[in-house]
Amino acid sequence: MRETPELWTCERQAAAEGFAAVCGVDEAGAGPLMGPVYAAAVILPEDCDLPELNDSKKLTEKKREKLFPLIQEQAVAWSVARVEASEIDETDILSARMKAMQLALDGLSVTPDLALIDGNRDKGHSAAITTVHRCIVGGDGISASIAAASVLAKVSRDRYVTEILDKAYPQYQFARHKGYGTKLHYEMLDKYGPCPEHRRSFLKKWEAKR
């Protein structure tokens, strides 16, 4: 069941050009003040049945959790990777995002002929991706494999935050805000200061006000 035909636009175009194994790539967690950035890569079969598949940001948490195992079960291949907060600080968030995407691609059990990457990263930055690829603006709305990758990346990151980081550092209440710069998060930072999982490069304005 394909919720919207346009979701397969990129895959149909790639198939018409002769690409067989087309992979979607997307990331999650670029904006939060803490934790790793995640990326996922997914190759979907033409006959997959993924009701309500869409960009993860347009899905409720319940729907993302429902789709997560279905994508894993039906995908020809899938992979999830992450780059830690410490490396984000050592380099920068864009480099970390590119590295996470390449790690996800490297983790696939099937080598893709073409990777479809969500967003516009053609200003020299996507050169870090060694797989043959195209950057698709709004890709998670016109590529089923990118949409599937967005779900895997988002759910994987949210689970890591709520099941691991929230328990390791309960005082910050990470499960409530997922690490984003909410009022609650800044209040906890004011009270406790940053923990090892915080991205210090993201806290420069906050630190300047202390």
Language-model segments: what does each one mean?
Residues 1-210:
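RNase H-like, Mg2+-dependent phosphodiesterase core
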